[in-house]
Amino acid sequence: YQEGSHNEYLLFLHRLIANLGYCNTNIPKLQTRISNNGKIRKIIKFSTWTYDQFNEIHKNWYINGKKVLPNDIDQFLSPLALAIWIMDDGGKIGKGLKLATNNFTLNEVKQLIAILDVKYNIKSTIHKTGAIDQYNIYILSDSMPILVKKIKPYIVPSMKYKLGNYI
């Protein structure tokens, strides 16, 4: 689920997944929820149906309960996947962009950086998060125009702020 402020993004994901036949086509509705501190929150959510194929995907991403980077991730890191990653876990930092990769090892983050470089000519660096053994990817400002050109068709208007003045 997402906070109500991300309504547009969640509806985009729903439409994408529903069109693939993996969830109900009924459009999710904004709901009210009371948080632990008594604050009223607006949320929106939907669920996918259960398929055996999802178990195979899960096996590629989790080994003994630990999240890992699949060896063939480069085959799946399409412009659409990159856009979703940014809308989910990206953030504008200065003139560049941060991608949250906290749960991956340093070697896995290096692998992702190499894929971004080889596949898309997107230059990036590794930033420590401040937590032990946690790292983020920082896409350099010089590569932002290249990135935006690839992902622009998929970025919902309410998420364009993550790309700064490049979009």
Residue map of PLM features:
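Internal intein/HINT superfamily modules and their associated LAGLIDADG
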Residues: 1-167
